Amino acid sequence: DDCLGMFSSCDPNNDKCCPNRVCRVRDQWCKYKLW
């Protein structure tokens, strides 16, 4: 499966961001997971 890179738009209900990235509802793009 391809994962979504940094700043890719994403769906918070179906988070396909790459490892150590997270899809936030507020932003709806993949960003670094800091914790």
Curated annotation (Swiss-Prot):
Disulfide bond entries: 3-18, 10-23, 17-30
Top-rank taxon: Eukaryota
Known partners and oligomeric status: Monomer.
Domain statement: The presence of a 'disulfide through disulfide knot' structurally defines this protein as a knottin.
Gene Ontology molecular functions: ion channel inhibitor activity; potassium channel regulator activity; toxin activity
Localization (cell): Secreted
Family: Belongs to the neurotoxin 10 (Hwtx-1) family. 59 (Tltx) subfamily.
Described purpose of this protein according to its UniProt entry: Blocks Kv4.2/KCND2 voltage-gated potassium channels probably by shifting the voltage-dependence of channel activation to more depolarized potentials and by binding to the S3-S4 linker region of the voltage sensor domain.
Tissue: Expressed by the venom gland.
Any one Pfam family match given in the protein's UniProt record, by short name: Toxin_12
Main location: secreted
GO cellular component: extracellular region
Keyword Disulfide bond: yes
Keywords per UniProt: Disulfide bond, Ion channel impairing toxin, Knottin, Neurotoxin, Potassium channel impairing toxin, Secreted, Toxin, Voltage-gated potassium channel impairing toxin
Protein name as catalogued: Kappa-theraphotoxin-Tb1c
